[in-house]
C-alpha cells in the first residue's frame, strides 16, 4: 500500500468503529495532536475514539484524503452525529457528559497524518474555530477551557 492508501484504510476503519484494526496500523509511539488539553498517545487516543463512538453511535467523520507530501498525508474531517450515549472524556481530563439527544455538526478541519514504514506515527488536527471535539462540546452546552 502507498501512504495515501494506508491512511484511507485507517480512516475507513475509524469511521466503521473498527478500532482494534485501526490500532494495528498505529506505531507504539503514535501521537495525536489537536484541540484537546495536550497531545495524547495511542492508548488514550483509542479510548477517546471508542468513547466518542459510544456517545455518538451514528458518528460520521466525513473523512476525505486530499493529498500527500512525502511521509505526510493531508485529509479533512467534519464530525456530525447525535449524542445518544454518555460521552466519557475523563481520560483527557474533560469529564463525562450524559446523553442529551442533541444532534451536532461541526466545521471542517484539516489534518496531517504521518506514515513511516506503512504505520501511522502522528495525526495532527489543525485547530479551526467551530471544528473538532471542542465544537462538539460547545454544541452540547459543555463548558471547557479548551481553545477552538
Regions found by a protein language model. Give the residues of each.
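C-terminal and inter-domain tail/linker signature
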Residues: 1-148
Amino acid at each position: 500500500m502507498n501512504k495515501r492508501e494506508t491512511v484511507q484504510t485507517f480512516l475507513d476503519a475509524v469511521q466503521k468503529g473498527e478500532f482494534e484494526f485501526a490500532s494495528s496500523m498505529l506505531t507504539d509511539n503514535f501521537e495525536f495532536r489537536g484541540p484537546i488539553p495536550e497531545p495524547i498517545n495511542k492508548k488514550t487516543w483509542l479510548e477517546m475514539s471508542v468513547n466518542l463512538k459510544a456517545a455518538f453511535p451514528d458518528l460520521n467523520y466525513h473523512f476525505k484524503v486530499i493529498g500527500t507530501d512525502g511521509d505526510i498525508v493531508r485529509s479533512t474531517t467534519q464530525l456530525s452525529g447525535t449524542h445518544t450515549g454518555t460521552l466519557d472524556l475523563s481520560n483527557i481530563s474533560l469529564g463525562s457528559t450524559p446523553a442529551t439527544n442533541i444532534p451536532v455538526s461541526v466545521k471542517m478541519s484539516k489534518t496531517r497524518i504521518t506514515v513511516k514504514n506503512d504505520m501511522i506515527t502522528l495525526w495532527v488536527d489543525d485547530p479551526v474555530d467551530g471544528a473538532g471535539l471542542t465544537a462538539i462540546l460547545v454544541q452540547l452546552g459543555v463548558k471547557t477551557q479548551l481553545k477552538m
